[in-house]
Every structure is written in C-alpha cells, then in structure tokens.
Amino acid sequence: GLLIPGGWAPDYLRRFDSVLTFVQYMNDHKKLIGIICHAGCVLSSANILKGRTLTSTPGIKHDLMHAGANWVNTAALIDGNIVSGRRPPDLPAYMPLVLEVLKTQESSE
C-alpha cells in the first residue's frame, strides 16, 4: 500500500510526474492508498478522484470537489482502495481503517 503524509509535503509531491504515475498505478491495481490532511491534493493531481468519496482537511475541500470527489466532513472513511483521514487528531479513527483495507488486500492475494 501507499500512505501519503499530510502537511506541506503533498504540495511538493504532486509536482512530480513519477509520483502521479505511481499513484495512478496503485489506484489502477486497487492497492491501498492512504491519505490524511492535505494528501488528497496528490490524488487530485493524479486525476483519480472522480466519483470517489473522501475526507481531508477542510482547507482543500474545494480542490477535491473540483476534481470530482464527494467530500465528507468526517474523521476517516474508506472508499474502495482509498482510505482518507481528515487531520492528525483523527489518526485513532484513520489507522484502523488503513489496517482493515490492508488485511482485506492481503487475504485476497
């Protein structure tokens, strides 16, 4: 799986085609993509959010919606292979979902 950190790192990561290609590969192969806080902007730049439901820090809500995502103000949620968390204080809700998806993927391989 792939976990993308929050903070300012995603704004830097989204500038690299190799990062976006890897995110698209992980999504195409239905592998776990975990995002929290500002990390959703990487998925937005990778153009994989149309029709997906996720959460993030409210500061990028409109960016994600303009990329086609359904944004929900909740601590954490799963949409297929994408696990999203709102902010670092929501890690207690986010991490069990990440582990749930990893277990599901491990048992199906």
Regions found by a protein language model. Give the residues of each.
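Active-site-adjacent pocket-lining segments in enzyme domains
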Residues: 1-109
